[in-house]
A protein has these predicted regions:
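Alpha-helical transmembrane bundle of multi-pass membrane proteins
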Residues: 1-197, 204, 208, 229-323
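TPR/TPR-like (Sel1-like) alpha-helical repeat modules
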Residues: 208-215
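Charge-rich, low-complexity intrinsically disordered segments
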Residues: 216-220
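Intrinsically disordered, low-complexity cytosolic terminal tails
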Residues: 221-225, 231
Length: 323
């Protein structure tokens, strides 16, 4: 079940690096290669940015739209997979700048849904003993998506295969996600008991049945709910300890974005091609591989009392500052 859920943030990562390795065959003179699209750097930048725009729109509207449509976590991730499939098929069959930008916008909508719904889905399914490790799989799926897109793009460019192989891979992943989602995946029991019941579409009996199917005992989840913090009302403010933690996380995330990491993931091939024209795609591939390696340790350390979330976060922030 967890493997199916994390396919959604995989699309987010895939979209980030989807065009990176392809810049060489998109921004060029048509006479240099038959695969060249003849795009300008501004057009390539627009196509890249449309993914971010779509992600911003979807992340802001996902929660209220889901409540309005009585849609649970499963339905939202199925919508994400549908958008990913449409976007990938459109990108695979077009060569015009407008349609490429439209495909990227749709893919961004998928990514926006994924980054909102996936952490909640994992949190509501994870047993308390490994909740931190399960939550880390969200970020691992993102960096795996980034690496896969860079790998497929580098392979297509260096071996002179059609660049359409890159969106075709994401289309295949989306198709698998849809099939498994409709045939096997189940709704989040936490959502059924919480928002689902409030909206009149869920029940405790259905949640218990799903947990039984997943091999989870009710006693485990009773202890989880007993440990969870109370839900605040619309006019209530979070405790001061919450506010301090939220500020720390927000500042760290903003610092991560201002460090320029996204510029590397989106444009490393174009940046490095001016210095290492023949090795630029491989440098980008190495960067994404290191990203995966550094995401693996928290899987084991985040629930370890000797490390925990705070020390890992401080280590990450310190590393960014030193770099």
């Amino acid at each position: 079940m967890v493997a199916w859920i994390v396919l959604a943030p995989f699309h987010f990562g895939y979209g980030v690096s989807q065009l990176n390795a392809l810049e060489k065959v998109w921004v060029c003179k048509p006479s240099t290669t038959t695969a060249c699209l003849g795009m300008t750097e501004d057009e390539f930048g627009l196509a890249t940015a449309m993914f971010t725009i779509g992600g911003t729109i979807a992340s802001l509207l996902c929660a209220p739209a889901a409540r309005y449509a009585y849609a649970g976590r499963r339905a939202c991730l199925l919508m994400c997979a549908s958008l990913a499939l449409v976007s990938s098929l459109l990108l695979s069959t077009t060569t015009t700048t407008k349609m490429i930008s439209m495909a990227r916008l749709v893919y961004g909508l998928c990514a926006g849904i994924a980054i909102v719904q996936t952490p909640l889905y994992l949190q509501e399914l994870a047993p308390p003993a490994i909740r931190g490790a399960i939550g880390t799989l969200n970020q691992l799926a993102v960096v795996m998506g980034i690496f896969t897109a860079q790998l497929v793009g580098t392979w297509a460019v260096t071996t002179h295969h059609p660049w359409q192989r890159v969106p075709q891979v994401s289309a295949a992943v989306a198709l698998i996600q849809l099939i498994v989602g409709y045939v096997w995946a189940c709704e989040s029991p936490g959502w059924l008991e919480g928002d689902g019941t409030a909206l009149g579409v869920g029940s405790a009996a259905a949640a218990a049945q799903i947990r039984s199917r997943l091999g989870c005992t009710d006693g485990v989840y009773e202890r989880v709910h007993a440990q969870d913090a109370p839900i605040l009302g619309a006019d209530e403010r979070p405790p001061r300890t919450w506010a301090q933690g939220i500020r720390i996380v927000v500042v760290t995330q903003v610092a991560q974005q201002l460090s320029g990491v996204n510029a590397i993931m989106y444009y490393s091939t174009g940046i490095m091609s001016r210095v290492l024209p023949h090795l630029a795609p491989f440098v980008g591939l190495l960067i994404t591989f290191v990203n995966i390696i550094m995401t693996l340790p928290p899987l084991w350390l985040i629930d370890d009392a000797r490390f925990g979330r705070r020390r890992l976060l401080l280590f990450s922030a310190t590393s960014m500052g030193l770099c």
